[in-house]
C-alpha cells in the first residue's frame, strides 16, 4: 500500500491511528521525526496473560509498531515495506498503566532497514528491548 509516510504523519497530527492493528490496541503516536517515533498504549487486564501480566505478544506488537512507524518516516511515496524479522528481550513485567515504545532507525539502506525499540513503563524503567529488519518493496 503506497502513501504510508503521509498516512502516518496524518495520524500523528490528527491523533488518529495509522493502522487497524494500532487502533485495536490503542497505540497512539506521541512524537514523530525522521527515523524516530515515540508511541504509547494503555495497559490493563484485557491485555494480560495467565500470569496476570501484559502478554509478551502485545509487547512485541507495540515494539513492531514503534519501529515500523519510525521506518515509515524514511520512505518515498513509491515505497512500501514489511517486517522480515524481529527479536524482543523482556526485562521486567508490565501490569497496568501506560507503556511507551521509542522506535529508532539504526540503518536505512536501499533494500533493507534495521531498527530498534525500547519499551518503558510510567517510572521510565526499561521493560523490553527489540530490534528488527525490514524489507523495502517497490513497484
Segments and roles (model prediction):
Residues 1-139:
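Terminal targeting signals and extreme-terminal segments of soluble enzymes
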Amino acid at each position: 500500500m503506497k502513501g504510508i509516510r503521509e498516512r502516518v504523519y496524518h495520524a500523528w497530527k490528527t491523533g488518529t491511528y495509522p493502522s487497524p492493528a494500532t487502533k485495536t490496541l490503542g497505540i497512539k503516536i506521541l512524537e514523530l521525526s525522521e527515523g524516530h517515533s515515540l508511541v504509547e498504549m494503555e495497559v490493563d487486564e484485557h491485555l494480560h496473560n495467565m500470569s496476570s501480566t501484559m502478554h509478551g505478544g502485545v509487547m512485541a506488537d507495540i515494539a513492531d509498531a514503534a519501529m515500523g512507524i519510525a521506518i515509515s518516516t524514511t520512505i518515498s511515496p513509491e515505497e512500501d515495506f514489511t517486517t522480515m524479522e524481529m527479536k524482543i528481550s523482556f526485562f521486567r513485567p508490565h501490569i497496568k498503566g501506560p507503556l511507551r515504545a521509542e522506535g529508532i532507525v539504526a540503518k536505512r539502506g536501499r533494500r533493507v532497514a534495521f531498527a530498534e525499540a525500547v519499551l518503558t513503563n510510567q517510572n521510565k524503567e526499561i521493560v523490553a528491548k527489540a530490534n528488527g529488519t525490514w524489507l523495502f518493496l517497490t513497484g
